[in-house]
From Swiss-Prot:
Pfam families: RsgA_GTPase, RsgA_N. One of its GO terms (cellular component) is cytoplasm. It is found in: Cytoplasm. The gene is rsgA2. This is Small ribosomal subunit biogenesis GTPase RsgA 2. It comes from Listeria monocytogenes serovar 1/2a (strain ATCC BAA-679 / EGD-e). Its cofactor is Zn(2+).
Length: 291
């Protein structure tokens, strides 16, 4: 019995990467009865029938799982936003951060297209960078030509996703990383049957000793399962101060003696971050129940 990680799922086959090789596997027949649906990123136990084919025997417990894209065991999410074209939006950045924080995935903020920004825009980005770094987030900026080495350092030994709205440079980032992999991944690409005209599915690409989920469509934000009372845990600087609130169930909205509001007034929490917290809180409270 071998252990490996699913790096692609297509037409009922699961492509499992183990010790430098890729095996085309099917799931055991009883998976459906046990309500087990393997995902790309799953760690699995499998047995091989020959040099290239095998059967998945069991799926290990997951650290986390995203719905769209359907991928499991993500260690890190590189959230790509452009400085300009489209302009950097703290509102959008905070919404992506909430979506990633709620899955207990480490976010890294990448701000692209800095070479296209004016001096005043660069100064404003620098202010935002300082604020997010003070919260505890890693932030790096890139020009039109991405800093591949910096990105590889983040990905090393991990499974990562790259997310962001359309037009911010996700494809440029992936393609620049992928260009270095032609020789290294030739064998894997052949095993997976990757071609120019194949339908795009979620797929883990090896980058150094890590993997990146090739998810071109990852630009939506999902928080259907997020409850109003748990939103505060997706804002680290709010979570850090909640213990100082007078009332145990404080939502940091209209309650008296709120340590979070006091921190906002003292400029210890960025006003825009608190504003976005309240906006999202109201959206969650006003959300219609789904049946």
């Amino acid at each position: 019995m071998l252990e490996g990680q699913i790096i692609k799922a297509l037409s009922g086959f699961y492509y499992v990467f183990s010790e430098g090789k890729v095996y085309q596997c099917r799931a055991r027949g009883n998976f459906r009865k046990r309500n087990i649906s393997p995902l790309v990123g799953d760690d699995v136990e499998f047995q091989i029938e020959n040099k290239t084919d095998g059967y998945i025997l069991d799926v290990m417990s997951r650290e986390n799982a995203l719905v769209r894209p359907p991928v499991a065991n993500i260690d890190i999410a590189i959230l790509v936003f452009s400085a300009v074209e489209p302009d950097f939006s703290t509102n959008l950045a905070d919404r992506f951060l909430v979506a990633i924080e709620k899955e207990d995935i480490k976010p890294v903020i990448c701000i692209s297209k800095m070479d296209l920004a004016s001096e005043s825009e660069k100064e404003q980005i620098a202010v935002y960078k300082d604020i997010y770094e003070a919260i505890g987030y890693d932030v790096f900026v890139t020009n039109d030509e991405p800093d591949k080495e910096a990105i590889k350092d983040y990905i090393s030994g991990k499974t990562a996703v790259i997310a962001g709205q359309s037009g911010v440079g996700k494809s440029t980032l992936l393609n620049s990383l992928n260009s270095d992999l032609t020789l290294k991944t030739a064998e894997i690409s052949n095993s997976l049957g990757r071609g120019k005209h194949t339908t795009r599915h979620v797929e883990l690409m090896p980058i150094g000793d890590g993997f990146v989920a090739d998810t071109p469509g990852f630009s939506s934000i999902e928080w259907d399962d997020l409850q109003p009372e748990t939103l505060q845990f997706c804002f680290p600087e709010i979570e850090d101060r909640r213990s100082g609130c007078k009332y145990r169930g404080c939502m940091h909205e209209n309650e008296p003696s709120c340590a979070v509001k006091t921190a906002v007034e003292a400029n210890e929490i960025a006003e825009f971050r608190y504003k976005h917290y309240i906006q999202i809180l109201q959206e969650l409270k006003n959300r219609k129940p789904r049946y």
